[in-house]
Each structure stands twice: as C-alpha cells, then as structure tokens.
Amino acid sequence: MLVNAWQKTFFFNFSQERVNITGAGRTDSGVHALAQVAHFDLKKKIETTKFLRGINQLIGNKPVTVLKINKTNKKFHARFDAKKRTYQYTIVNRQSPLALQKNKAWHIRKKLNTKLMEKGAKLLLGTHDFSTYRSASCGAKSPIKTIKKVSVKKNGEKIIVKFTSKSFLQQQVRSMVGCIKYLGDGTWNFDDFKKSFKAKNRLKCAPPAPSCGLYLRKIIY
C-alpha cells in the first residue's frame, strides 16, 4: 500500500516519472515496522517538505506514516547497505485476554521461565547454520547467518525478545521465538532446544510465533 501511494504521488503530483521503491526489509503479513527505510531514484528535483505532506495525505488514516525524507548519494541501497537490523518480539504472559495490545503481541497464558528462555536465546549468538528456523519458501542462497546480539527481558507481564543481525532468513525470528517459547513453557528442556537447533532441519522446529508480536525495530547503516 505504501509503495502504491508513493508511486501515485510521484506520477501524478510531482515528476510524471515511474518510480521503483526498494525497502530495507520484507516482513510477513501481520508483522509491524517501527523503523522501515526505503530508497528511490528520481530525475526531477522535488521539495521534500511538500512531498512528505503529500505522501502522508495519500496514506490517509491507514496505520502507516512517513517520518522523514533525506537526499542521499546515487549508490545508496536501502536493503544492501544496511549493517544491522534489530527485530523485537513482544509476548504478554498473563491469564486475562488482550485488549489494547490485541494483534500487537503474542498472548500466552501459561507461565514462562524467562531465565531459561534467555539461556536458549544466547545459544543462538554467533555464526551458525539456521536451517531449522528457515521457511520452506525462503529464497536465500545460504542458511548461514550471524546473530550479533540477543536479549530476553521481562517487564511485568511483558516479555521482550530482541535479535540483531545484518540480515535474517524468511521466518527466522518467528521460528526462533517459537522454539524459545517451547523452552519457556516446559514443552522442551534445554537439551531438546539444543538438539532442534543443531539438527539444521525445519521439521525439528517448533511452530513459528504468530506474526502479530513481531516488530522491525531498528536499522543501522
């Protein structure tokens, strides 16, 4: 939807040019983005303030907004120039149903052991073959990725899981969280979790966490 609005803005209001938009990352349906970056090439000069106002008017009341527009060099690529991406997964661990956080977090009623979840998450640090957490439809050439940072933090009834890497496989974060959840709720012990990871086999993965709790949190260039 955002790409379509951008193209309409350019084509009808600004440049009469067809513009291709490239985002920094692709997300599954239902996943949120707190920080998304995109680039486009344009021959005609535009007034950025006017453009920003125009694109947000076209977006209307949809839950999307463009916060800033910057001019950059011709070689910049929103996807390939990114050095780090941080994804955040939000779990609400309580008995009562969600209200304001509905469709924005994973509601889990069974009490979770966050210390054990953190132990499992830290096992994923470093460079590994993440085939267990790779979607069957993933188009990446290699399952090898490097997790640079992980954290599992509990704040009241909220549990926030974060992963930082240069890039991720399709459904990797949701799959890792699904396995960490199995560890936290007692479905698996730590040895089960480790065997699943080391198996490098998608069939050994727990069900992926639902998309509603996942957020693209930060992109660093």
Region locations from a protein language model:
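Structured-RNA-binding interfaces characteristic of tRNA pseudouridine synthases
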Residues: 1-221
